[in-house]
């Protein structure tokens, strides 16, 4: 993936370069980087930022959500990682970590469960080193607090994890863990 990313960045080093490029060229350089819908949204977002914001990328969650393809979690990740602003995230990996950590019961696609998980995410997101925390939470869910074979013995938050304390990490009757 890295060579494809480097090629993409070399061709479109600025938001202005990306905004003025034809979509077919953007898609060509996106080859090898994943979902093409992301490339289309990135292109539309670049055009929006150049046309409406004088090329200044927004930094706060409420403004980032206005960009095509950017939802609350992506906006939070951008705000936290790129701009070091306190902003919660709740991608699939983080949902799994926080649902186990807080023993939140229910399918995360349900509005009430999602609201609970957002509240947990917001409560635990620190004001300092927010970029490190955000990346760590995503990595924790991707590598340790995995869907089917969590590695609780090496988890840095194991001692505070309610599901671990209650021996319910993989209990389908009590927690959603298989997503």
Residue ranges and their predicted role:
Residues 1-153, 157-169, 175:
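Catalytic cores of DNA base-excision repair glycosylases
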């Amino acid at each position: 993936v890295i060579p494809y990313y480097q090629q993409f960045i070399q061709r479109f080093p600025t938001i202005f370069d990306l905004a003025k490029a034809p979509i077919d060229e953007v898609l060509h350089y996106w080859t090898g980087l994943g979902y093409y819908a992301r490339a289309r949204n990135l292109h539309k977002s670049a055009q929006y930022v150049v046309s409406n914001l004088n090329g200044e990328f927004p930094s706060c969650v409420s403004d980032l959500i206005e960009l095509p393809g950017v939802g609350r979690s992506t906006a939070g990740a951008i705000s936290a990682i790129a701009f070091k602003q306190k902003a919660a995230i709740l991608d699939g990996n983080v949902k799994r970590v926080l649902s186990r950590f807080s023993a939140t019961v229910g399918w995360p696609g349900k509005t009430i469960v999602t609201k609970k998980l957002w509240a947990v995410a917001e409560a635990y997101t620190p004001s300092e080193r927010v970029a490190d925390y955000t990346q760590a939470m995503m990595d924790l869910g991707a590598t340790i607090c995995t869907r089917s074979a969590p590695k609780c013995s090496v988890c840095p938050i194991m001692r505070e994890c309610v599901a671990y304390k209650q021996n319910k990490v993989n209990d389908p009757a009590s927690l959603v863990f298989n997503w």
